[in-house]
Structures are given as structure tokens and as C-alpha cells.
């Protein structure tokens, strides 16, 4: 980790070189996703539910990852919700899970070790201080070094808009882009926008769906749904980055249409899970104070909200951040060789990685001041 823990410089020549290295990583991750897409193109067509996917299937079709467990194989998924520039939370969780060690052990002897996977639910940037040069840079490093073990899903903050030759953050405030705009040309953010557009939205693992927000609107499901390939519908992908579960049983379609961020009810969730053939949905998007919450958990299915940014005195957050009230959490999903699945949340040890001895970002103050607007 430490070789990549450096602030962007305020010196134009130095930051130019730093950003060039980061954009090379952007290109590398896009190339990984393009190769995966080419190999998996069209494989969801005609598949009504996950039961129609072959055991052991692993592919990326469009913007939907599929990982169906091999019979007799164990899996261990480390899952992180929104990180929002909290680099210490990312590093802490990956180190606690010993994820990189487990990848190496699995590569050396896959018969004796569970298959380790890292699932990232999106919202890597904004709010916290270490967005593009902390969380996203490191996520790209891990994903390009272990592409068979890392799923980088898109959050609603990974959304840039171009208007009249200028790039804007799609969510306000957009601290990551606002902080760096005075120091970098627009083409840099155009390249990040290309990366964001390339990021997948969904992972289907066994009977669990991983997504940033939630399910599409009722109207889209009724009018457009064909089979699992509809998960790649552009409007469905956008809606799944923005929706939230509610305490209601059903949210009327007219109410869902009122805003980009919209609610869905318990029965709507249950119907969508049945449509997919899934039993559970794991998502981020929503700040939950306890970091991990079983929102729905009954015979119709399980919905978990996971939030991995926060910490009362986390130096990765601005002093006024509302995320200081959050206990940042991660979770482990284990699937045994016999098919039994368990979900275990764990508190992220971010404090250890606020220590300058363990996190070079905190050895000196940033040269560029974090900017909200």
C-alpha cells in the first residue's frame, strides 16, 4: 500500500506526472473490463433466473458480473460498502481480512484454500479527503493485480457529466473533482468519466445480488424486463445506483417517479428477488449509523445495507463531516464446500491506519486543500 500513499502536489509539473501514472491505471482497469466483457458478451440472454446459470460460471456480460460457485469449492467474499475517500477504512478492512495473503495462498494451492473475493459496492470518491489519489487509486491497483478476485462496482458518485466542454460531478457536493479542477485540465476528469462508465453495476454470486443502491422502478420492470440481460439496460443500471429500501410494503409507481433517488417496498423487493431467483441483496448507498443493517430478513429474502466510511475522529474526513457518527463496517460472506452460507459483519480498524507509521498520507498535510464547492 505505502508506495501509493502520496498527496497530489500543488506543483504543476509534479502533479502532472502523478496524474499520468493514475491515468495509466485507469486505462489498465478499463482494458481488464473490456477483455472480460468480450469473453462474456451475450451469456445472460435467455437466462430467466440465476438457476439457469451453469455451476462454476464466471463472466462479465455487459455491466453484470456473474460468479456461480463451483460444486465442492469454498468461497470467502470480503465486502465493502461506501468508502467515500476514507482510505484508512479501505486499508484497514483489506488488512484485517488478510485478503491479499489469501489470494496468494489460493493461487499457490487452490485445493486447500477458499477462493477469496473482494466485492466493492461503489462510492469510492467525495466526502472524505482521499478520493482519487487514495481510495480509487488503491482499488485500481488491487483490481488490476488480481482481476479474478476483485469486483469494482459503480456507485452513484462515480458519475461525471460533460456540458459545453466542462466536466461536473453528478452528485453535489462533488468534493473530489471540485478540489482538483483548479490544478488539472478537463481531459483528466473526462478520462475518469470513461472509467466510471465502464464500471459494472451488479455481481450475481450464487443466490446473492450485490449492487450499489437497490432494485429498479416498478414501471421499468413491468415494461422492459425480459431476462437477466435486462440488468444491463441503461436505465435499469442508473436506477439501481439510486434506489433505497423503505419500511413500507409497496411504494406507488407515481411516487417512485418523482425523484432520481427513490424508495422501494418490502413486497417489491421480494418480487424482484423471486424474479432473479435470488435470496439476498447486499448494497451500500445509504448512510447507516451502525454501518451494517439487516433491513429485511424474512422468508421473502434478506437485504443488507453496508456502509464502510466514517469514524468519530477519523482524520480522513473533514471536521464537519456527518459521517463521523457512523461506525464503519465491512462483512464477510462465506460459502462452504457443501453450499452453506454465512454472513459476518466486522468493525473496520481504521484507527490503526490513521497512524502515520502505517499510513503515509498522514505523515504530512496535503498540499491541495480539500474543497467542497
Question: Where in the sequence are the language-model features?
Answer:
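Feature recognizes metal-dependent phosphohydrolase scaffolds
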Residues: 1-373
Amino acid at each position: 500500500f505505502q508506495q501509493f500513499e502520496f498527496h497530489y502536489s500543488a506543483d504543476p509539473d509534479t502533479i502532472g506526472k502523478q496524474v499520468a501514472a493514475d491515468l495509466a491505471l485507469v486505462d489498465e482497469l478499463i482494458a481488464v473490463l473490456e477483455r472480460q466483457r468480450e469473453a462474456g458478451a451475450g451469456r445472460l440472454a435467455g437466462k430467466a433466473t440465476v438457476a439457469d446459470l451453469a455451476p462454476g460460471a464466471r463472466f462479465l456480460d455487459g455491466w453484470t458480473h456473474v460468479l456461480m460457485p463451483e460444486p465442492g469449492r469454498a468461497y470467502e467474499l470480503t465486502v465493502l460498502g461506501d468508502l467515500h475517500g476514507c482510505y484508512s477504512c479501505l486499508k484497514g478492512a483489506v488488512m484485517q481480512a488478510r485478503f491479499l495473503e489469501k489470494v496468494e495462498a489460493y493461487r499457490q494451492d487452490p485445493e486447500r484454500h477458499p477462493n477469496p473475493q473482494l466485492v466493492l459496492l461503489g462510492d469510492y470518491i467525495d466526502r472524505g479527503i482521499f478520493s482519487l489519489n487514495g481510495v480509487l487509486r488503491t482499488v485500481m491497483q488491487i483490481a488490476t493485480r488480481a482481476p479474478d478476485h476483485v469486483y469494482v462496482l459503480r456507485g452513484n458518485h462515480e458519475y461525471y457529466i460533460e456540458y459545453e466542454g466542462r466536466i461536473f460531478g453528478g452528485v453535489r457536493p462533488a468534493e473530489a473533482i471540485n478540489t482538483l479542477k483548479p490544478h488539472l485540465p478537463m481531459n483528466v476528469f473526462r478520462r475518469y468519466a470513461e472509467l466510471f462508465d465502464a464500471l459494472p453495476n451488479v455481481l450475481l454470486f450464487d443466490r446473492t445480488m450485490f449492487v450499489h443502491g437497490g432494485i429498479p422502478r416498478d414501471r421499468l420492470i413491468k415494461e422492459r424486463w425480459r431476462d437477466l440481460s435486462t440488468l444491463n439496460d441503461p436505465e435499469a443500471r442508473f436506477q439501481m445506483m439510486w434506489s433505497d429500501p423503505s419500511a413500507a410494503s409497496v411504494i406507488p409507481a407515481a411516487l417512485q417517479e418523482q425523484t432520481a433517488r427513490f424508495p422501494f417496498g418490502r413486497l417489491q423487493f421480494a418480487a424482484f428477488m423471486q424474479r432473479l431467483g435470488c435470496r439476498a441483496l447486499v448494497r451500500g448507498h445509504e448512510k447507516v449509523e451502525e454501518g451494517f443493517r439487516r433491513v429485511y430478513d424474512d422468508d421473502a429474502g434478506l437485504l443488507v445495507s453496508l456502509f464502510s466510511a466514517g469514524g468519530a475522529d477519523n482524520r480522513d474526513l473533514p471536521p464537519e463531516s456527518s459521517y463521523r457518527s457512523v461506525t464503519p463496517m465491512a462483512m464477510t460472506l462465506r460459502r462452504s464446500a457443501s453450499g452453506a452460507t454465512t454472513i459476518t459483519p466486522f468493525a473496520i480498524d481504521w484507527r490503526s491506519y490513521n497512524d502515520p507509521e502505517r499510513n503515509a498520507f498522514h505523515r504530512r498535510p496535503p498540499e491541495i486543500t480539500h474543497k467542497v464547492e
